[in-house]
C-alpha cells in the first residue's frame, strides 16, 4: 500500500473540520489539546488553536508521532498562520490541590476563553465550560487537524520549559525525560528527594 502523502494526510485530517464548516455553517473551528497529564513533574499545558483552512500548514500530526525537530519547525508556522492561538499552564501546586483532571479542564477553559469562532473540537475531555459549542473527539489529536495543531503547540512550549527547568534542577534529567517517570527520574527522586517542580500527589509512593 503506497505511503500517504503530506497532502493526502492534510485532506484526511481536516475531514471533520471541513464537514462542520460546510454542513453546519460554523464560521471557524479551533482545537484544544493537552500535554503533560502523566508526568511526575512540571505543569500540564493546554493549547487552543484555530487556523483558517486556506492557511493550513503541511506536516501537522499528533505531537507524539512527530520528532522534536519536526515539532520545533512546525511551531512558528502554526503561530504565524493561526487566527487564534493561546496556551494555559497549571503548575504542580494546582495539580496537587485540585487533581490532574480538574487542572486540565481549568487550563482548557482558560486557553479557549478568548475564542469567538464557531466551534471547538476537544481531544477526549467532557464537561468543559467553553465560550462556544464544542465536541469531544476520541483520539482527536490523530484525527483532527486543529487538535493536532494544538498538541504540537502545547508540546513544544512544555518541552522547552522542562529543558530550562533542568538547568535549575540538573539532578533529575528533565531535559531528557520531560518530567515523566523514567527509571532515571525515579532513582533521582529517591536519592535527592523532590524539588518544587514535582507533583507531590504523583510521587508520594516513591518517597
Per-range role (PLM):
Residues 1-207:
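RNase H-like, Mg2+-dependent phosphodiesterase core
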Amino acid at each position: 500500500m503506497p505511503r500517504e502523502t503530506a497532502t493526502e494526510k492534510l485532506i484526511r485530517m481536516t475531514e471533520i473540520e471541513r464537514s462542520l464548516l460546510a454542513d453546519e455553517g460554523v464560521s471557524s473551528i479551533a482545537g484544544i489539546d493537552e500535554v503533560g497529564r502523566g508526568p511526575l513533574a512540571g505543569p500540564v499545558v493546554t493549547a487552543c488553536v484555530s487556523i483558517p483552512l486556506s492557511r493550513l500548514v503541511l506536516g501537522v500530526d499528533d505531537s507524539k508521532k512527530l520528532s522534536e525537530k519536526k515539532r520545533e519547525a512546525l511551531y512558528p508556522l502554526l503561530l504565524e498562520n493561526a487566527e487564534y492561538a493561546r496556551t494555559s499552564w497549571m503548575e504542580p501546586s494546582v495539580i496537587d490541590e485540585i487533581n490532574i483532571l480538574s487542572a486540565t479542564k481549568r487550563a482548557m477553559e482558560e486557553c479557549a476563553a478568548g475564542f469567538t469562532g464557531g466551534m471547538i473540537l476537544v481531544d477526549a475531555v467532557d464537561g468543559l465550560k467553553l465560550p462556544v459549542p464544542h465536541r469531544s473527539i476520541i483520539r482527536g489529536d490523530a484525527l483532527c487537524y486543529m487538535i493536532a495543531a494544538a498538541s504540537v503547540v502545547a508540546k513544544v512550549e512544555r518541552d522547552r520549559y522542562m529543558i530550562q527547568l533542568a538547568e535549575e534542577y540538573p539532578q533529575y534529567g528533565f531535559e531528557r525525560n520531560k518530567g515523566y517517570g523514567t527509571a532515571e527520574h525515579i532513582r533521582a527522586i529517591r536519592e535527592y528527594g523532590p524539588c518544587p517542580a514535582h507533583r507531590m500527589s504523583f510521587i508520594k509512593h516513591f518517597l
